[in-house]
Structure formats: C-alpha cells, structure tokens
C-alpha cells in the first residue's frame, strides 16, 4: 500500500487539517521536477539557482508544517494530562466513598441496591461510569499516539522522496536536524500516559485482572472498515437475492389477482395500506445501510456523531442483512394473502403474524440478533417520546426527524388496528381483506385519531426544540425551529377540516390548507438547505452556493440534492391538484402510495448532508472524542460548557465573531463514554510502506 493511501486510511477525520499535507508535498516535488530547466539548453548555474530557490521554499514549507504539528500535539497532550488528572481524582473520590459505604454497611443490616438512597446509588454507579470514562480516555490517547507516528513517518517519507528525486542528502540532514528533535516526536509522555492508564484500570477497576482490563480498553482497528465475516456477506447476498425474486413474484401475482377481480367492486386498498408501512420500514433500513457505507467511505464519523460504541455497532452489511431478511418475510406474507385459498392460514392472520414478528424481533430480551443495537434503538425511541423530560442529543432529534418522514408508517399502523377492530368480519372462517367497496370508517377523518397520529412526529420535534431552548436559553435556532414544526399542526388541522366538510366552506378550508402547506414547504426547504446542510455560505469561494469545505468528492451531488429536495418538498401539489380537479379517491390512493417511498428517499439524501455538516462542526473544534466528566455539573455550568462546545467555527476561528447556529447537547450526569469514541481509534505500528513508484 502506498503511504498516501495508508495515511488517508488511518488519520482521525476530525484532525485532518492538522496532519502533514503529504499529498501537497508530493505534488510540490513532482512539479519542481517537471518544471526544472534542462542542463542541455541552460547553463549549470541557472539550474543550480533553480534548485536552490526551490529547496529554500520547500524547507520553509516543511518548517511551517512542523510548527503546526508541534503546536497541535502539545495542545492535545496538555488536554490529555488534564483529563487524566481529573479522572484520577474522580476515581479516588469514588473509591473513598465506596470504602466508607462498606464500613458503614458493616454496622447495620445488609441492604439490597433497591433499598439504597439516591446518593448511595450514585456512588455505585460512578464505578461503572469511571470504567467507561477510562475506556474513552484510553481511546483518545491512542488517537494522539497515531497522530504522532503518522506525522513522523510522513516527514521521513517525503524527505526521502525529496532526496531520491534531486539526488541529494539534504532532506535526510533536515530530518535529523529538525524532525527527530521536534517535541511531537521526542516527547514520550503519551506512551507513559497509556501505560499508567492500563495499570490504573487493571489495579483499581478490574481487581488486578489485566486480561479483563485490556479487553475493556480494546480499540477497534483503525483505517478502512473491516470486512464483514464471510457468513454475514453470504446472508446479505442470500436475503437480498431472494427478496428481489419474491418482489417480482408479488408484483406479477398482484396484477393477476387484480385482473381476476376487475369489475366486481372489490376494494384492495385495505391490503395495500396494511402492507405499505412494512415496505417503508424495509426501504428505510436498506437506505440507512447505504448511508452508513457512504459515511464510512467519505470519512464522516457517524459513530462519534450518534455516540455509538466503536467496539460494537452495526455496519452497512448488518443493515442490509436485516432489511433483506425482513423483506423476505414481507413478501412471503403478501404471497400467503394472495393465495390464501391454497394455504391453511386464514388471510387476516398473515399481516398479524408478520408485524407480530417485527415487534418481537425489536423487543426480544435475549442477547442475540443485535441485542445491543436493538436496546439502543428502544432507548432512543423512549427518549423521543418523552422528549420534554430529557436533554436532547443529536441522535434524539435525528430519529425524530426520521419519524417525520415515516409518518405514513404510523398512520398505516393506526389504520391496521382500526381495520381489525371495526371493519374486518371476524365471523368469516377464512377472514377477508379483499373487501367490497362501501362505507369506510378507518380511512376517513371522521375517525379523529388519524389527525392526532399525523401530528405526532412533528410534535416530538416541536417539544425537543422547546426543551433545547429551555436548556440553552437561545431563541435562535431552537424557537425558530420549533416554529417550523408547528406549521405541520396547521396543515393537518385544515386538511382534516377540508376532508370532513362539504359545500362552500369546504373550499375555504382548502385554500387555508394550501396556504399552510406552502408556508410549511418553504420553511422546511430553507431550513434543510441553510441550517441542516449548511449550504449557501457567503464564504463558499469556488464551491458556489455550497459551503467553504465539502466532504463528498463531486459538487454535482450537492446541486442534485438541492433540486431533489425542492421537488419532493413540493410533491404534495400533485395529489392535491388531482384530488380537487377529478375528485377520484383512487387517484389519491395511488399517489398516496407512491409518494411515501419518495419521501423516505428524500430523507436518505438529507441524512448524507446533515451528518456531513455535523462532522464538519466536529472538525472545526477538533472534536474526535468527547471530554466528559463523571462528576455531575449543575445546570448553569453545564449550559455554559455546551455553549463553549457549540461554537460552530470551533478552534479554527477562535478570535473571530462567534456564530451560534445550533445546539449540541450532551449529558454529563450519566456519561456514556465508551460510546462516544471514534470508530477509527487504535494503536498501530506504522508500517514501512513504499510508494516510490
């Protein structure tokens, strides 16, 4: 592997600009070689002056890079030493409190943890939190050690290449005189901190069991994503292949059934609505797998952003596997419905069995089938539903945003419950989902729960914004963002009034609803592009209409995403126009089935650029890991700390004007330190790669 590729694969993305600019040095050397005057047509003195002038410029650039690296390394080392001292103090306090509690326990009857006071519970909990805190700190030390090794190797490689191209030894001399005596290379305190951390965790937190301690401190491999196990790859191919084949079969079988029942007033929409939500979930999981793959390839650290455990999180292949497996079950269930007369399973039992399995798969308490990931999702869903009572983090409002694009899933779930409760004829031995057209209770707004369900995702985000305003006391962006979600309430209210009224007043509600939709679409579109994606930056330079720094390689991706977002944000105009002009429910039903998958696709595109913007904010603050204390802070201190961390320009523009755009909350009272590290943290031996080709 060439060192350029090796460096690109092993750097910490949030510190990218602080590494040696190896590729720029290579271009500088090759450009000088190509532009050098030929000794055959130019006198020797001119050639010597050319090379002398170039070398002066080259070594000046090397000095600037070396100064940058020394400064950054010194800052991070000082930060690591402060954190280590803080963790030592917190560990000592927790151990003292635990010993005091143990002595006091000897004077009274033994009590279970359920009978302990809140203060005593915190003491027991702090030991667990400290284990996670030291694991997080250890990962940050490994990051810094890799930074040290990669930069030294980069200088050695580029100076060696310099000497080879120009047939001199001045590069090696400069390395000995400057690089090998540079503080970032000669300072061995980082190695000492790593050793002391391992010893402290072994003796104080793991009872002297070094193997257990090192297992806790284990770091995932650095660099490109590791290949998935062979069996996982096999299952992905199997499930996805079977899913594609079964999907084609479902389409053909569905068309045949429609032809058979054509003209007999059979209503197939209950069946479509019941299975539509399941398809949207499968589509969402599959596209999320593509998101994950794209983030890894582009160096967007989604593991840090979502505060996942870098030692154990789902890769794109795992998401493809889950989506493919659930997709196969979805297709089998539909085929069982379509050919119910040939099976022993009543037709109405198939959807119940399918979604019952989906639900059991999610809440399965056994530690199998991605238990930790499922538990993380359930905990996140709970935090979304109870948003006003918790501090809101990125993962919380990201999931709530996904629910806004999956609102049809919630509405179809409500429809299914209503249909099975009020419309399905359970007295029929075979059940019935292909129903004759007639009065429908569940799909009309006369059943008022639908309007409430449609407002729920927007309500979750609305109260999250209010909670963030309460925590930060910043009207912008939180109250302005809450106003964006409040427009959804007006859209739903007037849509319900439009559908439940007749006569002239019906059109009054229609016009008000259209006005509300236009406001909502413009509001959300501008927020997507400017706030969530960070585009239309005045300092974009050559990245016209974008931002100063972009992660994805082609500008066309951004322009296509802007056009796509504009089109799909206003896609509601098509079904509304056709419904008003033709007043044909079948047209509304067809478009109501086509547009939700497109909205899921829009959210898939949105995810790429939303996390890119968050990643660049982390880069601006060189925030590769979170500096989180185990000791609880009061509300004022925590808010002040968040405001310091939330400065969008970060360390790059410390002396410039502060620009508060967005709040990124993090809980210091119950730290999840091991889940906040980078996926690319590891201690590696920098191999002697050769790219002299």
From Swiss-Prot:
Keywords: Cell membrane, Membrane, Transmembrane, Transmembrane helix. It is a multi-pass membrane protein. It is found in: Cell membrane. Residues 157-164 are annotated as: Important for inositol polyphosphate binding. Residues 441-642 form the EXS domain. The record marks 22, 26 as: Important for inositol polyphosphate binding. The chain crosses the membrane at residues 236-256, 268-288, 319-339, 343-363, 406-426, 478-498, 507-527, 561-581. Coiled coil: none annotated. Residues 674-693 are annotated as: Disordered. The SPX domain has high affinity for inositol polyphosphates, such as myo-inositol hexakisphosphate and 5-diphospho-myo-inositol pentakisphosphate (5-InsP7). Its affinity for inorganic phosphate is tow to three orders of magnitude lower. Belongs to the SYG1 (TC 2.A.94) family. This is Xenotropic and polytropic retrovirus receptor 1 homolog. The gene is xpr1.
């Amino acid at each position: 592997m060439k060192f350029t590729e090796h460096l690109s694969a092993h750097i910490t993305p949030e510190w990218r600009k602080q590494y040696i600019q190896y590729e720029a040095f290579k271009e500088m050397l090759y450009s000088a070689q190509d532009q050098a005057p030929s000794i055959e047509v130019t006198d020797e003195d001119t050639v010597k002056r050319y090379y002398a002038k170039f070398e002066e410029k080259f070594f000046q650039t090397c000095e600037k890079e070396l100064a940058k690296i020394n400064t950054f390394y010194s800052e991070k080392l000082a930060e690591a030493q402060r954190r280590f001292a803080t963790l030592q103090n917190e560990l000592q306090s927790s151990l003292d409190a635990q010993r005091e509690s143990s002595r006091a326990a000897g004077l009274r009857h033994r009590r279970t943890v359920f009978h302990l006071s809140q203060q005593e519970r915190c003491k027991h909990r702090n030991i667990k939190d400290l284990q996670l805190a030291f694991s997080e700190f250890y990962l940050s030390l490994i990051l810094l050690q890799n930074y040290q090794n990669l930069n030294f190797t980069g200088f050695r490689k580029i100076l060696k290449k310099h000497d080879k191209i120009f047939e001199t030894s001045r590069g090696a001399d400069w390395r000995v005189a400057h690089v090998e005596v540079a503080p970032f290379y000669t300072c061995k305190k980082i190695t000492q901190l790593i050793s002391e951390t391992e010893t402290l965790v072994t003796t104080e937190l793991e009872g002297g069991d070094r193997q257990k301690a090192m297992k806790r401190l284990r770091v995932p491999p650095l660099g490109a994503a590791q290949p998935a196990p062979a069996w996982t790859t096999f299952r992905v191919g199997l499930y996805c292949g079977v899913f594609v084949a079964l999907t084609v079969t479902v389409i053909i079988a569905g068309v045949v059934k429609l032809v058979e029942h054509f003209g007999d007033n059979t209503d197939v929409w209950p069946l479509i609505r019941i299975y539509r939500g399941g398809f949207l979930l499968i589509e969402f999981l599959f596209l999320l797998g593509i998101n994950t793959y794209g983030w890894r390839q582009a160096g967007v650290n989604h593991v840090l952003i979502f505060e996942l455990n870098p030692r154990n999180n789902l890769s794109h292949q795992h998401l493809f596997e889950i989506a493919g497996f659930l997709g196969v079950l979805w297709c089998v269930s539909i085929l069982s419905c379509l050919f119910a007369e040939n099976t022993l399973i009543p037709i109405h039992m198939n959807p119940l069995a399918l979604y019952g399995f989906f639900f059991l798969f999610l809440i399965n308490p056994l530690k199998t089938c991605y238990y930790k990931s499922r538990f993380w999702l359930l905990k996140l869903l709970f935090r979304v539903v109870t948003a006003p009572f918790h501090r809101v983090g990125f993962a919380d409002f990201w999931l709530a945003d996904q629910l806004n694009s999956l609102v049809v899933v919630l509405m179809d779930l409500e429809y299914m419950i209503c249909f099975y409760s009020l419309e399905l004829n359970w007295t029929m031995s075979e059940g019935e989902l292909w129903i004759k057209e007639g009065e429908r209770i569940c799909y009309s707004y006369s059943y008022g729960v639908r309007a409430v369900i449609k407002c729920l995702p927007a309500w979750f985000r609305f109260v999250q914004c209010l909670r963030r305003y309460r925590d930060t006391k910043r009207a912008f962006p939180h109250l302005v963002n809450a106003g964006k979600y409040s427009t959804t309430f007006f859209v739903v209210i007037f849509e319900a009034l439009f559908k439940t009224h007749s006569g002239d007043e019906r059109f009054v509600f229609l016009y008000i609803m259209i006005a509300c939709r236009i406001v909502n679409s413009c509001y959300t579109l501008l927020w997507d592009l400017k706030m969530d994606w960070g585009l239309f930056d005045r300092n974009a330079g050559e990245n016209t209409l974008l931002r100063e720094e972009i992660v994805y390689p082609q500008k066309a991706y951004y322009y296509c995403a802007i056009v796509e977002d504009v089109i799909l944000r206003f896609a509601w105009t098509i079904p509304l126009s056709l419904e008003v002009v033709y007043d044909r429910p079948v047209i509304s039903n067809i478009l109501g089935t086509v547009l939700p998958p497109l909205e899921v696709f829009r959210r898939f595109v949105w995810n790429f650029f939303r996390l890119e913007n968050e990643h660049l904010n982390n880069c601006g603050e060189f925030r590769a890991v979170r500096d989180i204390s185990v000791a609880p802070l009061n509300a004022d201190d925590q808010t002040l700390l968040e405001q310091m961390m939330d400065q969008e320009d970060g360390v790059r523009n410390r002396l410039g004007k502060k620009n508060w755009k967005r709040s990124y909350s993090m809980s210091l009272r119950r730290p999840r330190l091991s889940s906040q590290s980078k996926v690319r943290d590891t201690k590696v031996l920098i191999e002697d790669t050769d790219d002299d080709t």
